[in-house]
A protein has these predicted regions:
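Bacterial Sec-dependent N-terminal signal peptides
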Residues: 1-24
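Acidic/polar, glycine-enriched structural segments that form the non-catalytic walls/loops
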Residues: 23-346, 366-369, 376-385, 514, ...
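Catalytic cores of secreted or luminal carbohydrate-active enzymes
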Residues: 110-129, 649-695, 699-700
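Beta-rich accessory regions
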Residues: 154, 162-165, 173-193, 199-200, ...
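Carbohydrate-binding/catalytic loop surfaces
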Residues: 330-343, 392-412, 468-492, 539-551, ...
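Acidic/histidine-rich catalytic neighborhood
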Residues: 452-509
Length: 754
């Protein structure tokens, strides 16, 4: 019997190895027959701090340049006014029933002022008309290299270095040498036309008030320096040579001064000492990406969904890196259209930043996901200052619409000054801790941050007639847009979810640190808040206020997903509530959905084990809401009724929610129990994943063949209690593990290996 079990185990391992080898041979990425001619369809490259968009403009091959920390950070003078307060908003809404003064203070300036805002760097251009027809354009996400091949035999290769702040290009087999130009943004008006200028013209770069930067060219090098607002400036240094006949190669560096992420050595000085050629830099670059992709892999029988997942995780690795800012609306791909980006390219904390980091945890990219909590820790002081100035209490609430430094920008008041934003952000500290099982992180950052959020909720809340806590005014993004009834006098399910999650997490964290007095206090606070409001339609927006129209934001269901405060594992009554809520959203129709609605809904459908519905919505997202380069464009690009919105502002959160949904279909551990393939579509007969991460610091690999789970391998990084649903017995296996221990589960055995 032991021999038979061992044989089965070995066969499973061999099949898994062969399966993984087959996966590595599959191409994932982008392939076109022409170079894109629109900036939001360009080939994206990036390393978290600098980014490129490769496209063709006016007969030139254009490498748009971006730097994640290049911001105009001018202060908002209105936010220094004495009337700037939560109490002022409460008085205007509750007593005067009039938002006009609130709009004048918080909203109006964002429609006429051009800053604070993210700003573009410029572009490198090569005239390519003489190269003739393009044969192939290809981005291989496994190497993060873009290759363009022309029918004349010329080849261009491009990458943004994964290990430093440089980019590289190389052309081979050129019929004649190409010239190179560095195009700077136009900050002074010269009468030229601008692409797609909106009516108020607030997006014009010329409104920032800068002088055009200084460009210096000597032989085969160019240096460009641009002064922005205050102490912020940017420098680009570009150099090139011809190391062989018909070959042109070069490199460039982008640096800043005056930001949290600026260098001590600027680009020109750095490039004077930089001696790496294209090939040397490429080896280091591809080594980094090899390591990145070794963290986790998937294989699906649906090649469209599989390729999109790899594209999303490529963008994740390109947009979120240690010692760089986190993912903002467009990350390192600021609009290359002569304007400031949509919504200023800011940090939208009512959904966008949060969704952008959903896939990092279970995809086992903790270093990249840690970038978000690193930034939240960095802006903690500014958040506490904002809390004192606007809410007039101690504790921590972060502006919902924020700059690079976490300061308020403004916009629709119910959301730009949302009263529980930090509760959702606290969830990311919680997830980083739970997936990494890092007690040091818990003690030094996670609990101190979450504790201050909990303290803020205690201080800002009031008691109602039933002695239950409530907010003086509440909101539910982005219900009722910017109207008076977007402010609720009864605490919404969105705000309540943020509050209840924060107290639940704070108590759990305090317990883990042995702080029993703290834990007891947070639990007492939790008991003072009401339960979630619901009716026959499911979860409502607020008590006695059901969702009655199609809406893009699923804020009223936050308690279910992503928080897991409500889960179908909690019994039939809760399961019915969740399913009614999802059904009601679908029943109201998709008229006012946008791309991220489909991907968020797919996550929810995976949580209720409805893989077919999840896959269906993910396919709609790809075909209707994504640019050919995979960028999420928010509106229905097919104009086939998937929403009434047909515009195309580019933001990334929908992309990363897509990746998260795929991962929810393959593995779930949010309840503390690992489940593999919980939401596989009916037609999928085989799938596999390698080294996905579960809560508790467990790395999980599993294969699914002929419509059945074949094997599960779990490695315990830190030790601790493992709970896994054994698909062969349908029983929950619970056991204490040691650091490094490997458990293999097959149809006939569970085997340990130290």
């Amino acid at each position: 019997m032991k021999t038979k079990k061992l044989l089965i185990l070995l066969v499973g391992i061999i099949l898994n190895i062969n399966h993984l080898q087959a996966k590595t041979q599959t191409f994932h990425g982008l392939q076109f027959n022409t170079i894109p001619t629109i900036w939001d369809e360009a080939i994206p490259l990036g390393n978290g701090i600098i980014g490129n968009l490769i496209w063709e403009k006016d007969g030139n091959l254009r490498l748009a340049l971006d730097r994640a920390d290049l911001w105009d950070l001018r202060p908002v003078k209105e936010f220094e006014y004495p009337s700037y307060s939560y109490q002022f908003v409460c008085n205007e809404v509750i007593r005067n029933k009039d938002l006009s003064k609130v709009r004048a203070l918080i909203d109006d300036r964002s429609r006429k002022d051009c800053a604070p805002t993210k700003i573009p760097v410029g572009a490198i251009e090569f005239p390519i008309s003489k190269l003739g027809k393009v044969k192939n354009v290809r981005l291989d996400v496994h190497t993060a290299v873009c290759t363009i091949t022309w029918e004349c035999g010329a080849i261009g290769k491009f990458f943004t270095s994964a290990i430093d702040k440089t980019g590289h290009f190389r052309f081979e087999n050129l019929p004649e040498m190409l010239s190179i130009e560095l195009q700077a943004p136009r900050f002074e008006d010269d009468g030229s036309s601008i692409q797609r200028v909106s009516a108020p013209r607030t997006h014009l770069l010329t409104r920032l008030g800068y002088k055009n930067g200084k460009m210096t060219q000597r032989n085969n090098s160019i240096v460009y320096r641009q002064k922005a607002y205050g102490k912020v400036s940017c420098e680009v240094a570009l150099k090139w040579n011809s190391p062989a006949p018909q070959v042109l190669e070069g490199s460039y560096c982008i640096t800043t001064q005056g930001t949290w992420y600026s260098e001590t050595i600027q680009a020109a000085d750095f490039m004077k000492e930089y001696t790496k050629n294209f090939q040397t830099a490429l080896v280091e670059h591809t080594n980094w990406w090899n390591t990145y992709w070794e963290k986790s892999q998937i294989h699906l029988p649906d090649p469209v969904l599989e390729n999109q997942w790899y594209l999303e995780m490529y963008k994740f690795g390109s947009a979120s890196r240690k010692n760089a800012p986190p993912i903002c609306l467009q990350a390192v791909w600021t609009a290359d259209n002569g304007q400031t980006p949509p919504w200023r390219g800011d940090f939208h904390n009512d959904l966008n930043t949060q969704l952008s980091y959903w896939p990092g945890y279970s995809a086992n990219h903790l270093e990249e996901s840690r970038v978000f909590t690193d930034w939240l820790w960095k802006i903690k002081d500014n958040g506490e200052d904002f809390t004192r100035r606007f809410f007039k209490v101690e504790g921590l609430n972060v502006p919902c619409i924020a700059t690079l430094e976490g300061k308020a920008i403004g916009g629709w008041s119910p959301y730009s000054h949302q009263p529980t934003t930090s509760g959702w952000l606290a969830h990311h500290f919680y997830q980083q801790w739970k997936y990494e099982a890092d007690t040091k992180f818990l003690e030094s950052q996670a609990y101190p941050w979450v504790k201050e959020v909990a303290r803020y909720f205690e201080n800002v809340s009031v008691k109602d007639a039933k002695n239950k806590r409530k907010l003086p005014l509440s909101t539910s993004p982005e219900i009722n847009d910017n109207e008076l009834d977007a402010w609720f006098q009864k605490t919404t399910n969105y705000d309540l979810a943020n509050i209840r999650f924060t107290y639940t997490a704070a108590a759990e964290m305090a317990d883990a640190l042995g702080l029993k007095k703290d834990a007891a206090h947070w639990r007492r606070q939790l008991e003072e808040w009401p339960d979630f409001a619901s009716d026959s339609t499911g979860l409502t927006i607020a008590p006695d206020y059901p969702l009655t129209v199609s809406h893009r934001h699923l804020s009223h269901m936050l308690a279910f997903h992503p928080f897991g405060l409500l889960d179908i594992s909690q019994g039939k009554e809760v399961e019915s509530l969740i399913k009614r809520s999802i059904h009601h959203v679908e029943e109201l129709g998709n008229e006012f959905w946008i791309g991220y609605t489909y991907t968020w809904l797919a996550n929810m459908q995976a949580r209720i084990f409805d893989g077919d519905a999840a896959a269906r919505n993910l396919h709609i997202f790809i075909k209707a809401f994504c640019s050919p380069n995979s960028f999420h464009l928010n509106g229905d690009q097919l104009k086939k009724g998937y929403t009434s919105f047909t515009y195309r502002p580019f933001t990334l959160e929908g992309n990363f929610a897509f990746a998260s949904a795929i991962q929810e279909m393959l593995m779930q551990s949010h309840t503390g129990i690992i489940r593999v393939f919980p939401a596989i579509p009916e037609g999928w007969k085989e799938a596999s994943f390698d080294k996905m991460r579960a809560i508790g610091g467990f790395l999980v690999s599993a294969s699914y063949q002929n419509g059945k789970v074949q094997s599960i391998t779990i490695q315990s990084e830190k030790g601790g209690i493992l709970k896994v649903l054994n698909p062969f017995t349908n029983q929950i296996e619970k056991r204490e593990t040691t650091p490094g221990e490997i458990i293999k589960i097959t149809p006939n055995t569970i085997q340990d290996r130290p």
